[in-house]
Amino acid sequence: MSFNLRNRNFLKLLDFTGKEIEHLIALAQDLKHAKYAGTEQQKLKGKNIALIFEKTSTRTRCAFEVAAHDQGAHVTYIGGGSQMGHKESTKDTARVLGRFYDGIEYRGFGQDVVETLGEHAGVPVWNGLTDEWHPTQIIADWMTMLEHGNGKRLNQMKLAYMGDAKNNMGNSLMVGAAKVGMEIRLVGPKAYWPDPALVAECNELCKISGGKIVITDNVQEGVDSVDFIYGDVWVSMGEPEELWATRINDLAPYQVNMSVITATQNPAVKYMHCLPAFHNDETRVGKKIEEKFNMKGLEVTEDVFESSYTICFDEAENRMHSIKAIMVATLGD
């Protein structure tokens, strides 16, 4: 089956069917193989792409820049000091940039900003991350799971997400799983469970796809027999440090350590993380957390993160291939 996603925005996975998501994954796999083989064909030659980053980034920025370069496109980086939303409305910015550029990436805060860009730019707009959604990450995640899934299809896999299940990763993983028929278990304290309206919407999607959503505060129930465990940061650099104590105390029982790995009863289980991860005291934040809370590592321990269970760096590499696929599918010649 062929898909035509040309000129489509990529703002959230709710906008796409399961088959369209699988098409993007397959395209990312093809582009990855072509890059390794030295046979990549440039589909974005002569295109100009704006990268708007109101939030800082390493992986997302590098992934977009390298993917665009590989495909023959030119990029302009627009940082947090731009006039968008300050001296010029998002709507006006969209209409201006849409005259200069063939595609626009946005990474920032409210989903309403990227939706406004998508409505008014007149060119494809891609969501590099908002407070509500992180859709490009999921294409990379599902691609990585297929690489490490021992031949299983996505609809045969079980994934446990540990921690804050109401953040952008919890939302995106739940929707992504519901779209492709995967079983996902969101494991965390009740105060961190996702919005009931979104859960209801995803349960309706599961009736079509055959997926399954389990939400629990019981770690043993959540991880038993899963193929993958997924973690995300507990503390954000954008929030006051006085909130850290509450979040860390609430989420401490959901740290991924070797006991959790053992509890899966699956020797082939793999650990995933969208990165950056706080797994030791080798960063300023990690050192501060160790001094203040007497913890080496937060969402994952060092022994798990540095073990053969971890596939985080394959996952990080696949950010570039999957972002390239999204740009080629929506903008490529």
From Swiss-Prot:
Subcellular location field: Cytoplasm
Q: What does this protein do?
A: Reversibly catalyzes the transfer of the carbamoyl group from carbamoyl phosphate (CP) to the N(epsilon) atom of ornithine (ORN) to produce L-citrulline.
Q: Name one GO molecular function term.
A: amino acid binding
The organism's taxonomic lineage, starting at the top: Bacteria, Pseudomonadati, Pseudomonadota, Gammaproteobacteria, Vibrionales
Q: Name one GO cellular component term.
A: cytoplasm
The protein's annotated catalytic reaction(s) are:
carbamoyl phosphate + L-ornithine = L-citrulline + phosphate + H(+)
Query: Which EC main class describes this enzyme?
Result: transferase
Q: Which GO terms describe its biological process?
A: arginine biosynthetic process via ornithine; citrulline biosynthetic process; L-arginine biosynthetic process
Pathways per UniProt: Amino-acid biosynthesis; L-arginine biosynthesis; L-arginine from L-ornithine and carbamoyl phosphate: step 1/3
A Pfam family it matches: OTCace
Organism, as annotated: Photobacterium profundum (strain SS9)
User: Which positions are annotated as binding L-ornithine?
Assistant: N168, D232, S236, M237
Q: Which family does it belong to?
A: Belongs to the aspartate/ornithine carbamoyltransferase superfamily. OTCase family.
| Record keywords | Amino-acid biosynthesis, Arginine biosynthesis, Cytoplasm, Transferase
Q: Which residues bind carbamoyl phosphate?
A: S57, T58, R59, T60, Q83, R107, H134, P135, T136, Q137, C274, L275, R319
Q: What is its EC number?
A: 2.1.3.3
Quote the InterPro entries the UniProt record gives. Answer: Asp/Orn_carbamoyltranf_P-bd, Asp/Orn_carbamoylTrfase, Asp/Orn_carbamoylTrfase_sf, Asp_carbamoyltransf_Asp/Orn-bd, Orn/put_carbamltrans, OTCase_ArgI
Q: What is this protein called?
A: Ornithine carbamoyltransferase
